């Protein structure tokens, strides 16, 4: 049965661009002048340039010793019709050292009408005639998807997954507790969340996933969302060729072997050379390269070394029959001069799409990193490998990479790594790239000596390999500066008009008065937190910086709280660092709650004083106080990293008896002076791995009944509230006009 999607009828307005096609047909009587022709026959080629478009410079191949060349080469430019677009045509002569300009002409694109196609002659030096064929059309099918709705692939997945979950949930809960599951409408949407926290989060999440898999809970989940360290485990799991036929148990054993080695062992000359060759290829193609690329390669070599060519879009096969929960990953877009706690756009990644819900703009995964203009790809690159994205998703660790490898000097001797990470802001890690270079040469160069050019590049590459190797194995500036460490990609929203975009979703009334709640004034971590989250992205910047989402708050709730996903039950696992094992565990959850309220998204009230009343527990349940009023508010089961019952029981209900059994479970997580579970520990001996893995495996299994009870409650709520995507046109208009008014305000 198909359902009406109200978000599909909300128009995310955008301006259409023009596609200007130029076919360089031929030229006759190409000349270098009377004297020049006596010395040499021209080797002509044509260069086309439009300054107002990103992929601005294009050129034909050159012909040796040909005064009547026939090229028949077509080139496309994506143009903003509101700009004064002028085509500059340059006839060039290819030489070994420096190419020579034979003549230049211009053509105003505004003289063309949409739908028109014509041949235009150009005369150079009163003798040479060149014929170009030009056409102009509207780009009616952009490469970005502009919509508030989920993509069709995710909708189809959800429908098929509901069918699977209905049977799985009946099996899990038994006939009595699942008697309310009459149809897929009654199936609650369950999401599993994993926090950041480096390898601690990854190892802990591996134990969680094993428990969820073996207990049948995973078969009842629609989504699994990760941030930073948790995304590394999700990437390892979903990229494994034997998953889901082979469960997490076997895959976790492979993971334990992979993380038992020192990451410095990956920095062999042969591997560094291979890394650098790959980065050189990426850089020479016109894509930005940062330290995050290197970090992603190291993470990839550690965790998925035998599948380094895996891409995000290739993970679609893991959900092709809705056999697994849909994996969702995240990073932040940040601005160079603003703290990420004040401003950050959440970017979501799935095997189907990558995009920002705040602006209603999404793209296929293989287009992320390509060069866009006004929603259309102007230069497509190969899809980034999964390990590059793993580096972006966990890029906080590339910032303090010297601490990760233990090669730092005397800097910050009095601070812990956690304290350093706590103090990092976007201003520390993002270079203000004022030049915003397109990496395109604006000067002609020699083209006949292609062998010489290749030799030059090889020499240059070899020297770069040497420098990079020296930098990687020595205490160099590469390690001692944080600036420029953030991931960088081409801005896929370049040239768009954001004046009519929607900040996140038109779920409820979104007027200025709705922001004056006293509860939003209370700071959780910083007085300025989320102060500028309504600001738009800079659509004039050619590149954007993408960083670890944990730098704003360490739980990926924004992915799951999108009302289009209609999540009923959220099971979150928080592996965030705390000052001690007995410290309150709600900081990240409180930040998520505040973010949700500022975006008018339903979220249960988080009472931090439950810690004072009930003490430290393995998990806490937060429900809407009044479900009839707090419509669409999910239930949250929040697991924290705590060693409580695991000390006494080797499995739920089975006490530890021998001295060895008790000793293996007698450990602290944050109070251990040797810090085996530090956020910056990237080597886990087998015992440390097993302790953390088994702890979270136990904690999850020990609370399976809590999860089942919440599922039963969610089924009943679904039956009483079958529609979870109610949107009125008045709400849509209120949000639109609020955004226009906000964006028109002058900044202080």
From Swiss-Prot:
The active site is at residues 228, 548. The modification Phosphothreonine is found at residue 268. Residues 428-458 are annotated as: Disordered. PROSITE patterns: C2, PLA2C. It is an enzyme of class 3 (hydrolase). The modification Phosphoserine is found at residues 2, 434-435, 437, 505, 514, 726, 728. Residues 442-458 have a biased composition (Basic and acidic residues). Its EC number is 3.1.1.4, 3.1.1.5. Its main location: cytoplasm. There is a cross-link at residues 540, 605 (Glycyl lysine isopeptide (Lys-Gly) (interchain with G-Cter in SUMO2)). Pfam families: C2, PLA2_B. Activated by cytosolic calcium, which is necessary for binding to membrane lipids. Activated by phosphorylation in response to mitogenic stimuli. One of its GO terms (cellular component) is cytoplasm. It comes from the Eukaryota. InterPro entries: Acyl_Trfase/lysoPLipase, C2_cPLA2, C2_dom, C2_domain_sf, LysoPLipase_cat_dom. The N-terminal C2 domain associates with lipid membranes upon calcium binding. It modulates enzyme activity by presenting the active site to its substrate in response to elevations of cytosolic calcium. In the presence of phosphoinositides, regulates phospholipase A2 and lysophospholipase activities in a calcium-independent way. Interacts with KAT5. Has primarily calcium-dependent phospholipase and lysophospholipase activities, with a major role in membrane lipid remodeling and biosynthesis of lipid mediators of the inflammatory response. Plays an important role in embryo implantation and parturition through its ability to trigger prostanoid production. Preferentially hydrolyzes the ester bond of the fatty acyl group attached at sn-2 position of phospholipids (phospholipase A2 activity). This is Cytosolic phospholipase A2. It comes from Oryctolagus cuniculus.
